[in-house]
Amino acid sequence: MRFQVIVAAATITMITSYIPGVASQSTSDGDDLFVPVSNFDPKSIFPEIKHPFEPMYANTENGKIVPTNSWISNLFYPSADNLAPTTPDPYTLRLLDGYGGNPGLTIRQPSAKVLGSYPPTNDVPYTDAGYMINSVVVDLRLTSSEWSDVVPDRQVTDWDHLSANLRLSTPQDSNSYIDFPIVRGMAYITANYNNLTPQFLSQHAIISVEADEKKSDDNTSTFSGRKFKITMNDDPTSTFIIYSLGDKPLELRKQDNSNLVASKPYTGVIRVAKLPAPEFETLLDASRAVWPTGGDISARSDDNNGASYTIKWKTNSNEAPLLTYAYAHHLTSIDDSNVKRTDMTLQSATKGPMTALVGNEWTLRETELSPVEWLPLQAAPNPTTINEIMTEINKDIASNYTQETAKEDNYFSGKGLQKFAMLALILNKSDQTQLRNPELAQIALDKLKAAFLPYLQNEQADPFRYDTLYKGIVAKAGLPTSMGGTDDLSAEFGHSYYSDHHYHQGYFVVTAAIIHHLDPTWNADRLKAWTEALIRDVNNANDGDEYFAAFRNWDWFAGHSWAGGIKPDGALDGRDQESVPESVNFYWGAKLWGLATGNTPLTKLASLQLAVTKRTTYEYFWMLDGNKNRPENIVRNKVIGIYFEQKTDYTTYFGRFLEYIHGIQQLPMTPELMEYIRTPEFVSQEWDEKLGAIAPTVQSPWAGVLYLNYAIINPAEAYPALRKVQMDDGQTRSYSLYLTATRPHFFRRSLLAALARHGSTRRPSLPSSGDDDKHEDGFLLRFRRLNPFNLKHRIY
């Protein structure tokens, strides 16, 4: 393949100041989305603690906050057998693992994945694609011959959102070290050796070495030059290229079938890249002298309901444009004016193929931001359902709020608060919803405020603490007993160790936004400070915020959030996320808070993140038929289950039933999720292939989740089901019926489908409760008149 290296015409982004990796200003002040939400000191609301689990390998002199939920977080801590990976992609890196030979930085670049089967479990049938992982193998390790009997010291000397600089150094010798700039999408592993003798180790047999200058007399054991092409005996066969960029050529000796060792100490840069195919060798040669050292990110809105984010890569040199690998979602949204696409690809760890791009600045655009705000796009339910919905709302509002919202943990309490907040919202927006009962609307809002007040005062069963070490808000329960906790690191789903913050905070932020929207005067100052502290903890865009880390949960390169926080034994499969909708719920909540407070940059930023989340969800988490990023048998699962950087697992953390695996991807059902994120195409495929057969048999609250999701494509069938089935603890019957009845063509869908399938005589599959005729005078009677054949129907 012919390839011409070009210098992209870069659009310069002015940066006045930044938190490493996050630019604070774009070219137009009015368009900038990285604007402070607040500078309020959270210690005036939340008692402060210093987190008990400190990073072991962070440079404490640079003043930076150690990231807790980042792709680089494993670098800061020890792990079991030193096997916790760092995944810049397309390479996976492990430090000081015990897989034989001198310790160093191990490179893994698997072209094939390991698929594992699961036996039949509960209502989940046998699958030959229960999980997908990468085998742990030393493809190539960068080390030093001086480290044969010592373990090098390690330190992360600098970091930003897109990179970390790792130093391995000889103990008691600060002048002998290797610096590794580890950067997202890096096409090469870069190692800056200082006064150490390079050594390259592989668990595979090295079957050939080609040097660009000369070989030894016997043509077998010693090689000299600035470029070495190494071929392994793995399957499929791998070829790596080693580039020596120092002042003098490098001389390597093949010590045995697995080791290449330099003849003397070396000072200079060595770069290593996997060669996917012979035709890409000239491309790697042309880009070898320019490497990434980090990056800045900015985001801006435009005038056409769109927004974009820009990654400006930092490099060691402007000698040539940078070569970087991009994920699938980058390729579908990137502005090609600043980059050159190539045909060179490598497999990522779990996101499918990555494609190499040439260019120092990436601008990625989202042109269709969600139009959803507080209510469904068609906010009024079908008029024939209003009386029944109001009857159910009366029942739900008459329930015991304290029992549902004052539980022992914040997660389930937050779910309860949000479900009651949705009722207060639709009653108090009666001009749009047509659900008119002013007295009941006031009761709903008053009861919601009373239930929310203990959280606002931080007097709930598990109060929050402000952590001065990692600069965040944590639950007390998982802290040591000396700090008032239980010593149970898993308490609150690991919230005290920074797991699931966007899930937990999302429910509270949505609730707070609704209260402030309906009554802007209620505890206004404290509510604003409290809510914005929770937002800043998860999604802080302020470059100068001294109280919170930047973008704790959000990953601008991956295009989605990470849930997993600090893991004392290491995150052995990398970062993870299970519930996409609960991450959506947080960003929707941030969007609503922006609307409620008139903070347009926050609203647009959250809208951009929702759009990027939607894009990446259908690339990596939820799989439409024909998805190219996964093996076909994984695609047939329709959802990943638990997604890790190094593994996908068709299960959940809390059990293995189909309704669990798929249902956790459907809650909480909100207008944002129903109207924008979950598409009819995907819901139809998932229902036909996975859920339609089991939904009528589910006798747990998951049935309520499944049928409310089904309402996206078939509200007329879902509505009577939702009258009967159990509800999830974050779901009310009245709001479920309301959402269902707001779906476009609520009744006409049924009639059209019936006429289209007039040859069938099969009734819709609905859960039975023995009272099918209970509402004969209401919905069922009208439904049967519209659908006289009692036909099964599904709308696509």
Curated annotation (Swiss-Prot):
Region annotation (alpha/beta subdomain) ranges: 277-367
Record keywords: Carbohydrate metabolism, Cell wall, Cell wall biogenesis/degradation, Glycoprotein, Glycosidase, Hydrolase, Polysaccharide degradation, Secreted, Signal
Transmembrane segments: none
Annotated catalytic residues: D500, E578, E582
GO process annotations (BP): cell wall organization; polysaccharide catabolic process
Glycosylation sites: N219, N400, N428
Domain spans labelled GH81: 31-759
GO-annotated molecular function: endo-1,3(4)-beta-glucanase activity; glucan endo-1,3-beta-D-glucosidase activity
Effect of E582Q: Abolishes enzyme activity
Region ((alpha/beta)6 barrel subdomain): 382-759
Signal sequence bounds: 1-24
Catalytic activity field: Hydrolysis of (1->3)-beta-D-glucosidic linkages in (1->3)-beta-D-glucans
Activation and inhibition: Tris binds the active site and may act as an inhibitor.
Chain residue ranges for the region called beta-sandwich subdomain: 31-276
Temperature remarks: Optimum temperature is 50 degrees Celsius.
One cellular component term from this protein's GO annotations in UniProt: extracellular region
InterPro entries, alphabetized: Endo-beta-glucanase (IPR005200), GH81_C (IPR040720), GH81_N (IPR040451)
Its biological purpose: Cleaves internal linkages in 1,3-beta-glucan.
Protein name: Glucan endo-1,3-beta-D-glucosidase 1
Source species taxonomy: Eukaryota, Fungi, Fungi incertae sedis, Mucoromycota, Mucoromycotina
Gene: ENG1
